[in-house]
Structures are given as C-alpha cells and as structure tokens.
C-alpha cells in the first residue's frame, strides 16, 4: 500500500519535510497532497501568507525529496498526471508530491486511469541474470546481503527461495534487519561491521562476491566496516538498476531480476548450511532496586 498525508500550503508542507526526506531515504512509498495558491493569488503581486521565497519554493523543496511531482493546474491533463505520479510512487517505492491549487479543488475532471507497470527490456534482464550466475558460480566465498527494498517490493519469499537454491549464507543490513528471519534460509544475522559479531562481520568483509539485493549503499549499512568496502566486487540490484562490476543495466525491477535468476536455477536438495555464530549472551534479569537507572537496565528489561 501507499502512505498518504494531506497538508496546507507552506507551513503545513514544510512541517513534514523531515518525515518525507526520511521516507525518501528509506524507500517508503508516500503520497503528499499539498495545497498551493491559485492562479489569481500567484500573480497578484503580493507575498502570500506562508510563502517562503517564491510561489514555487514548496515545489522546489519537495523535488529534492520526492521521485516525482505534479501541480494540478490543468483539469484536462490532471488524470494522466496523477496516474503517472502514483505509478512512480509504487514502482520506485519513494514519496511523490501532488500540489492542488486553491482554484482547482472543485474543477471537474475525467477519471484517473490505472497505468500498466512500466515496461522493461527482458533481454537486458536475461543478460544480467546470466552474468550474475556466472560470477556466483565462479566465486569462492559468495554471500547474499538483503536490504529494505526486498520488503518494499514484496519479493521477500522469492529472495528466500533464491538463497535456498543458491545455497548462500545470508546477511541483512542494518536497515533490512528482520528480513528472511522466518524463511528457512542460512541466515547469519545483521552486518554491523566493527560493531557486530566478528563471525558475522567476516562473512561480508572476507567475501569475494557480495550479492546485494535491494541494498542501499549508505553509511548506516556499510560505513562501519573496518576497511573501505569496494563495491566493484559486488553484484548490486537496487533502485531499478543492476550492477556487475562496471556494467550497469538500467530500469530493471528487482522482482524481474529475481524471477530470471530463479528460472535458471532448478530446485535442489538443501545442502548443509555453515554453522551459525553463537548467540550473544544478552544481559537479562532486571532487578527492581533503588540504584539509578542506566542503559544496561533498559537492555535487561527489553531482553526479559
């Protein structure tokens, strides 16, 4: 589904900038319905209440934190504009802005069409899948890394099946923690770099081929590595792009790549997974006493 927020022009819209920027960074689909001045007010020569620098300042600010924007100033083109923006919101899993001028709120218009999914080049998908599998089969220590886009695009079950067929150990990123936790894959926890368990960290740091699905290459996900990570040695599928070294296949949905890979790998008996790292000895047993509260007490309360 999509999140929706309706706000007033200027003050209302600017109050949600931080939340919208977070949604953009974390690939959360969100529709912002924002008011804006009508044609008469926009050309009155007066500075309007809640106007920042110009009438278009709101639109320009949100253009930095949304994947598509539209101002519904024309009732004839509004249905197609709305349909385009909503499709981009779903296909890119990022926020979009729909500005509604005051004098257009009651304007009649045609029904909004439902656009078919954006087309992609199946030959490019097939070529990318072949190149990925060749790299995976040639690697000595491949590891699969899954991130938030796997959940956003609804491919968690298919990615789990891919991990089982490839018999790869799986890590999640910090932003993707909790993914595939109950899907029966060879899951080794969340990669936290120098802050994580050494055995878990070594799986990625020492891998000759990280296979990254839906991975956001951010500092919170990979910036805590003891050494600068060379993503050129990785296979990366995210933001409708598929990367193999210096090769980039544009406009390929994550789901299309996963399906193409599964078509090339027949189901097989599951091999013996590598041993999971030992469970950390988390602090437990909160004692109700008169000593000052500390961070360790909160950890014990949560673990209990």
Range-by-range predicted roles:
Residues 56, 78, 84-138, 263-270:
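Conformationally flexible catalytic loops at phosphate/diphosphate-handling active centers
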Residues 148-237:
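Glycine-rich, anion-gripping cofactor-binding loops and their flanking helix/strand elements
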